[in-house]
Amino acid sequence: QQENDPSESKLDLSLCAQRLLLMGCEYVLITGTHENTQQVRNTLFASSGIIRTDDWERLEHTYHGSGCTLASAIAASLANGLSVSDSVLEAQDYTWHTLQAGFRPGMGQYIPNRLFWANDEEDSEDEHEEKEVIIEQPEN
């Protein structure tokens, strides 16, 4: 098999997940963010096998904070009572949208916009345009 053969990669990732599960983890989520593919494939494993596999459109930039965003979103979903499988799906969806709305504050990687849902249509058209804010003082 070739070095970049997807079937070999999937087998290797399954073995990695099984090793982590044998060390005491209940679940292992392996993400495909660093693969050279058009889709990002994330797979959730348990001792019983694969729980779910989700494919996401690969975005064009590189990001700093995507893994932290995903882990935090999973934890928040679990804390709100969702099942592990549903938490992973919801967190992936949230994370993908934060990346899609991400921004580049300087010359480095893009940063997830974790408040993407709070942006209105005008803000998303030109995020860098300065907005004039007028605060009216109450009359005494």
Show where each model-derived region lies.
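Short pre-catalytic strand/loop immediately N-terminal to key active-site residues, enriched for Gly-Thr
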Residues: 50-64
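Short, small-residue alpha-helix embedded
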Residues: 61-84
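Charged C-terminal helix
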Residues: 85-140
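Glycine-rich beta-alpha junction loops
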Residues: 32-36, 57-60, 92-95
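Residue-level signal for inorganic ion chemistry
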Residues: 31, 67, 87
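Conserved phosphate/ATP/ADP-binding segment of small-molecule kinases
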Residues: 1-51
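Phosphate-handling active-site elements
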Residues: 50-52, 77-91
